[in-house]
């Protein structure tokens, strides 16, 4: 196994299961003997809860506010160690409606770099808020991560988010050297989901890294604030995350510059698979009474 540091980031539509998928994959990497650092880049501070068995880890910003400033903190103040010695940090953010949460990401990453947090790690993983690819939330794309993995499903908005994130990766690909590692499909049991995910990956100039089947054992584990690998290590679902980890581990050097598509092209893809019907423009702007009068 390579000792070279790999910096990866997980993006995806809010609610797609990005944080939990990344934690289970990282738990599997730790089982393989890899030394892991997780940097949570979401104000909800839920990027490490399954690794630490906690509701939410104290964040860099909240601890800095208590101490006076981030300069008053030590690395051990913000870093916790969880399952399989995975090191965990949450950047945090301000109260809703106050300030810029993206600045918390910038502050945290700068603090971690200056205090040697990355020393000895094989992987640093950034778990980033929803599909936001601007401001501080884009820092893992602009300056840190070499590989971006997008968690998606066969639902239209998840695919839209994947395409949007690909545009962000493309923007910084030449200046920052970041690449798209691939798509990870979290099954939602929609029609032709696997085929659709593979087709979207092809359109984006990347590949479907893994199709994660839906299994209720995941919910049972999460209710106990555990990854499936810790809760039910012999289960079929635990093996799915080990397979995902093996594929990402073997993907070093293979990520590519993405080729995002237009909204029209995305809708055409959905229509090709029978997921979406061609829009009837004749009904746009018509009231119920007007449609009834026209026999529509």
UniProtKB/Swiss-Prot annotation:
Catalytic reaction equation(s):
N2 + 8 reduced [2Fe-2S]-[ferredoxin] + 16 ATP + 16 H2O = H2 + 8 oxidized [2Fe-2S]-[ferredoxin] + 2 NH4(+) + 16 ADP + 16 phosphate + 6 H(+)
- Whether DNA damage counts among this entry's keywords is no
Q: Where does [4Fe-4S] cluster bind?
A: 100, 134
Q: List the NCBIfam families.
A: nifH
Entry's family note = Belongs to the NifH/BchL/ChlL family.
The entry's function note states: The key enzymatic reactions in nitrogen fixation are catalyzed by the nitrogenase complex, which has 2 components: the iron protein and the molybdenum-iron protein.
Quaternary state and interactors? Homodimer.
Q: What is this protein called?
A: Nitrogenase iron protein
């Amino acid at each position: 196994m390579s000792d070279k540091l790999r910096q990866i980031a997980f993006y995806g539509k809010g609610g797609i299961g990005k944080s939990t998928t990344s934690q289970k994959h990282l738990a599997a990497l730790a089982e393989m003997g890899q030394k892991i650092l997780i940097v949570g880049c979401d104000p909800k501070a839920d990027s490490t809860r399954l690794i630490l068995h906690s509701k939410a880890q104290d964040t860099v910003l909240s601890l800095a506010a208590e101490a006076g400033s981030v300069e008053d903190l030590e690395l051990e103040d913000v870093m916790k160690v969880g399952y399989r010695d995975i090191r965990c940090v949450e950047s945090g953010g301000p109260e809703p409606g106050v300030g810029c949460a993206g600045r918390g990401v910038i502050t945290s990453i700068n603090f971690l770099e200056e205090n040697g947090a990355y020393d000895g790690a094989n992987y640093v993983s950034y778990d980033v808020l929803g599909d936001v690819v601007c401001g501080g939330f884009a820092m893992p794309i602009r300056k840190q991560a070499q590989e971006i993995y997008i968690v998606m499903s066969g639902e239209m908005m998840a695919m839209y988010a994947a395409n949007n994130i690909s545009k962000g990766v493309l923007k910084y690909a030449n200046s920052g050297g970041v690449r798209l590692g691939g798509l990870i499909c979290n099954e939602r049991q929609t029609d032709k989901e696997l085929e659709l995910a593979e087709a979207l990956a092809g359109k984006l100039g990347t590949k479907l890294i893994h199709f994660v089947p839906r299994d209720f054992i995941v919910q049972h584990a999460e209710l106990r604030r555990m990854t499936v690998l810790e809760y039910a290590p012999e289960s079929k679902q635990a093996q799915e995350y080990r397979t995902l980890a093996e594929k990402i581990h073997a993907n070093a050097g293979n990520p590519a510059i993405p080729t995002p598509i237009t909204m029209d092209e995305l809708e055409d893809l959905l229509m090709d698979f029978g997921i979406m019907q061609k829009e009837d423009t004749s009904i746009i702007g018509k009231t119920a009474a007007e449609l009834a009068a026209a026999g529509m």
